[in-house]
From Swiss-Prot:
This is an intracellular thiol proteinase inhibitor. Belongs to the cystatin family. The keyword Cytoplasm applies. Keywords: Acetylation, Cytoplasm, Protease inhibitor, Thiol protease inhibitor. This is Cystatin-A. The keyword Ion transport does not apply. The record marks G10 as: Reactive site. One of its GO terms (molecular function) is protease binding. GO terms for cellular component: cornified envelope; cytoplasm; cytosol; extracellular space; peptidase inhibitor complex.
Amino acid sequence: MDPGTTGIVGGVSEAKPATPEIQEVADKVKRQLEEKTNEKYEKFKVVEYKSQVVAGQILFMKVDVGNGRFLHMKVLRGLSGDDDLKLLDYQTNKTKNDELTDF
């Protein structure tokens, strides 16, 4: 679990700048997202994230996909760590200023 986690089960953390670890998680679920959206993303850079402790960890990520376009992803990182990742949901047509919320 990342050091920025609040540690409060069920509580969603404040938004934090993306870290290399969070970018790595996003990169691992990028293909799942591309299959669901039928798009290929040349740029895929997480700019901020929030986390929620559950049976594992839910990560909410704001991703810059280029050309002024952003999307939000909801990813479950299971108890076994970074090899146990599942894209739970996503929202497209977001802007840089859209707040990252639980969805």
